Amino acid sequence: MKKTAVLSTVAFAIALGSASASFAADNRIGVTIYKYDDNFMSLMRKEIDKEAKVVGGIKLLMNDSQNAQSIQNDQVDILLSKGVKALAINLVDPAAAPTIIGKAKSDNIPVVFFNKDPGAKAIGSYEQAYYVGTDPKESGLIQGDLIAKQWKANPALDLNKDGKIQFVLLKGEPGHPDAEVRTKYVIEELNAKGIQTEQLFIDTGMWDAAMAKDKVDAWLSSSKANDIEVIISNNDGMALGALEATKAHGKKLPIFGVDALPEALQLISKGELAGTVLNDSVNQGKAVVQLSNNLAQGKSATEGTKWELKDRVVRIPYVGVDKDNLGDFLK
């Protein structure tokens, strides 16, 4: 009798353990971040982790792809071998989306891309592929609006009084959809508002503050240094690097970024940065987790959420931030 009771207890424990393991596996989501030390992706990673805790019952297998697509490809293979029920992928190279989809598709695993848009063709190639991100055109237009607003309100910004903005532009990663589109539309929006522009320098800072500082330092050491009136940056990380360079040269120039990083907001409050565009990491993080969790459980991607899908894409809106509305965003 005693032996039977012991065996029953062991069997119950094994069954309970199996059920717990099964539950964990059912909610196991593999995540790859293109590189952990990117300013904005560091925020995104924290928001994803925070939302997973709020939702509950999720085990995140988080990976740093170290800005190498080959590493990310290997990470996806390992995640699939560990039995993840969904993938959340921040691509290193958007052109690699078909490779990731091929891996996920062979195991019938849903994949939610985020931050780097794989493009409609890639999403359309697999019925369980989704994208959470923004409309980069919107960020360029809003940044252009911010610059135009301050340019028109402050005639002193026109250093040579020619009615034209002489600008330099720090571009993100070449080929990255956000970098290409922000660069195009910020200038188009300025021109559409009747402001003439003249590009003095443009170069990639690869989203990186240190690289951006070096670029701006070179520009401020050139023969055109005194002609620069505005510094435009595809993200706040590079804007912070630009600010360091201007300080080193004893110059104060209007600098505009994108992301609304906490440190950028503080610098706007001090008058050291002119403006930024909120890239909403909180809502993007929530959408990534909520879609991935639903898909991992075999549910509709947006079931029980506020997100709207169009062609299996969720777009989170941008918001312009300057000294006039800064109080709405400072925590």
Curated annotation (Swiss-Prot):
Binding of Ca(2+), residues: 158, 160, 162, 164, 166, 229
Chief location bin: periplasm
UniProt keyword list: Calcium, Metal-binding, Periplasm, Signal, Sugar transport, Transport
Keyword Protein biosynthesis: no
UniProt-listed InterPro entries: Bact_Solute-Bind_Prot2, MglB-like_PBP1, Peripla_BP_I, SBP_2_dom
Location in or out of the cell: Periplasm
GO molecular-function terms, A-Z: carbohydrate binding; metal ion binding
Pfam families the record matches: Peripla_BP_4 (PF13407)
Positions of beta-D-glucose binding: 38, 115, 176, 178, 182, 235, 259, 279
Biological function: Part of the ABC transporter complex MglABC involved in galactose/methyl galactoside import.
Domain notes: The calcium-binding site is structurally similar to that of EF-hand proteins, but is in two parts, with the last calcium ligand provided by Glu-229.
Subunit record text: The ABC transporter complex is composed of one ATP-binding protein (MglA), two transmembrane proteins (MglC) and a solute-binding protein (MglB).
Protein name listed in UniProt: D-galactose/methyl-galactoside binding periplasmic protein MglB
